[in-house]
Amino acid sequence: MKKRLALLMALVMVFSLCCFSAPAAFADGKTVINVMSFTDEVPNMINRFVETHPDFADKYEINTTIIATTDGLYQPALDQALASGGADAPDLYCAEAAFILKYAQGDMAEYAAAYEDLGIDVAAEIEAAQIAPYSVEIGTRPSDGKVVGLGYQATGGAFIYRRSIAKDVFGSDDPAVVAEAIGAGTQSWDKFFEAAAALKEKGYAIVSGDGDIWHAIENSSDQGWIVDGKLNIDPKREAFLDLSKQLKDNGYHNDTQDWTEAWYADMAGIGDQPVFGFYGPAWLINYVMAGNSGGSAPGEGTYGDWAVCPSNVGFFWGGTWLLANKDTTKAEAVAEIIKWITLDATEDGLQYGWANGTWSGEQGTKDTVASGAVMAVSNGELDFLGGQNMFEAFVPANEYANGSNLTQYDETINNYWRDAVRQYTAGELSRDDAINAFKTNVADNLDVEVDF
């Protein structure tokens, strides 16, 4: 899910993690569990599990392969590893929102083990932990109705804004005031653009680039890219063409692209125009914005000058699901790991420590997690947000998270669409030509029926 780690993972690939090393490489007699991921997030969680479960550590060794999603490298490598099978195949693997359906419901779903076949009482565990319904929905295989994957985060989105700019333009940094200004809950962009005009008058950009509204649009659409085997352009996604052009033509953003240095610079307030806000889940704050704010304590850079309010459109963005190989010979051990990360709602589980910031390292930042039972007893106050409890905004936002608009081709098709939109807003293509170029890319590169 988190492209913030793309560069790091590209560097990691230089080392031996690029491919599976043979289980025989471990000479201590332990059983090897192969793990495959696209960032170090889940591997770090598993390492923590091993550290806190000495009996498990006495019997098992974790062999990790990390391949970044950069340049589309992860999925082909995972597909080959699953199809090839054998001792080097992953016992446990990860998939993010952009391609989870491929592995839980699509072309590669046959390789996933049902959680119940691993010995997990999945229905009872889900009920006890109050797991977010969309996480279960996305991880359920249609062919047999069985859960084959669960996430550990809840990724409902909100609007994250600069307090100082809110005071200057709207007279208050109160989340209720800003929510009203951007039209929170209206499922419309009308008030947002009224706010953009007011911000522009005082020299501010409302967002950094069109990508900042894309994720809200993409994940609030009613239908996905594929309907009944044919390419489908949901009206809300088609409207992105016009909304993006409106942003650019009026100078309402800095025309950056997400996951670039210019985008990060706007988080620190050092871009072309000071940027008012970003759309995203809690993980965007913890793992992207905080580290790019130009400081590490209130008063440094923009650190502490942020707050969160409900979004004008309900959406979610991201998430990672854990799946097990149906052919694993270590089902009991794999089940222990999966349960601790995705289903354990006790104070000893990953999710409680993560939600409350009691772990060290990356999982030491507070985050919204999939367990409603954990969220009910967790505190989301952050210095980065001026002491605001972010859970007050993010927990209600999770009601908008669902898997109904996801497809197994999202990562690829999203890239085609956003490229076409940028060509249109730059004046390189007409609106109709941009849509046709997008359709041509899909038709030429994917096994999807396209109407022109």
Regions found by a protein language model. Name each.
Residues 4-6, 18-105, 124, 345-352, ...:
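Conserved N-terminal structural module of periplasmic/extracytoplasmic solute-binding proteins
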Residues 9, 13-17:
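Hydrophobic core
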Residues 26, 110-112, 116-117, 286, ...:
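Mature extracytoplasmic/periplasmic domains
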Residues 31, 58-60, 64, 83-86, ...:
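Extracytoplasmic/periplasmic substrate-recognition and gating elements
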Residues 95-158, 300-309:
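Hinge/lid segment of periplasmic solute-binding proteins
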Residues 137-159, 183-232, 236-238, 273:
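Extracytoplasmic/periplasmic solute-binding protein
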Residues 191-200, 228-262, 289, 302-307:
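Glycine-centered hinge/linker elements that transmit conformational signals in sensory
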